[in-house]
A protein has these predicted regions:
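Alpha/beta-hydrolase-fold catalytic nucleophile elbow
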Residues: 108, 148-149
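Hydrophobic positions in alpha-helices of CheY-like receiver
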Residues: 132-136
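Conserved SGNH/GDSL esterase-like catalytic core that processes O-acyl groups on lipids
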Residues: 32-36, 42-130
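General small-molecule cofactor/ligand-binding pocket signal
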Residues: 71-73, 146, 189-191
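Catalytic His-Asp segment of secreted/periplasmic serine-dependent ester chemistry enzymes
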Residues: 48, 150-237
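N-terminal secretory targeting modules
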Residues: 1-38, 42-51, 61-67, 99-100, ...
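A short helix->loop->beta-strand "cap" motif at the edges of active sites that frequently abuts
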Residues: 139-144
Length: 237
């Protein structure tokens, strides 16, 4: 019985992932660089045991150290586009990320936009992404903007883990290309997580969509490299 229960835990976590979001309070500590990690379930750490310690923002915090404060503003199953079924910009997490007055914003959205019910066109996606960037840049002072392509998505191991059967795996590459264009057109820094994870099924959990601990670590390292490059050039953090 215990073995059966243990075997069922990943599936239970996967099922709950799309429907629950635990809000953790974020206190802004003065005298530090403030980095807001904005996103959906990938940023939230969906399906990760002890997600608040193992998701990529937590790993990034350990990589950067005490000079910066990293806060995650993420809600499962949310879309970048306001025309999607669950827009991120209508969430309290978005308002909190603005109130946080970040020095740097790292955005990782787009996977949920791949669903047929949410997708309009690459042009519409790029336009609404530019609007999100503009909203953050309207803050004073304007933060540095880093945007990430969605990571690669894979088929689940079996039907019990297929909680994301409306995600269009074949559309994720198109969205990744759209994000690259957005970065170039809007002067944002880019982290290409799609290229980083392409062909690396071992970096994802049973559902094929959410990174496991190794995948979250790889994402954090990629973001850290971009932030460190900016720092070496005299930027933040």
């Amino acid at each position: 019985m215990n073995l059966l229960l243990l075997a069922a835990l990943p599936a239970a976590a996967a099922v709950l992932c799309g429907y629950t979001t635990i809000r953790l309070p974020v206190g802004r500590k003065e005298g530090k660089e403030h980095i807001a990690c904005v996103g959906d379930s990938v940023t939230y750490g969906c399906t990760l045991p002890l997600f608040f310690l193992r998701r990529y923002p937590a790993v990034l915090q350990r990589l950067i150290g005490s000079d910066a404060q990293i806060a995650a503003f993420a809600v499962n199953d949310r879309t970048l586009q306001d025309t999607g079924n669950k827009p991120f910009r209508k969430e309290r997490a978005f308002r909190q990320s603005m109130e946080y007055r970040p020095d740097t914003v790292v955005i990782l959205l787009g996977t949920n936009d791949s669903k047929d019910s949410n997708w309009i066109s690459a042009e519409a996606f790029r336009r609404q992404y530019a609007e999100l960037i503009a909203a953050y840049r309207a803050l004073s002072p304007a933060p540095r903007i880093v945007i990430c392509t969605p990571p690669c998505a894979f088929k689940p191991f079996n039907r019990f883990f297929y909680i994301t059967n409306d995600t269009r795996l074949d559309r994720v590459p198109e969205i990744a290309e759209a994000v690259k264009t957005v970065a170039a057109e809007n002067g944002a820094e880019l982290v290409d997580l799609y290229a980083l994870t392409q062909g690396k099924r071992e970096l994802f959990g049973p559902d094929g969509l959410h990174p496991n601990a190794a995948g979250a670590k790889r994402i954090a390292e990629a973001v850290f490299r971009t932030l460190s490059k900016s720092s070496a050039q005299g930027g933040k953090p």
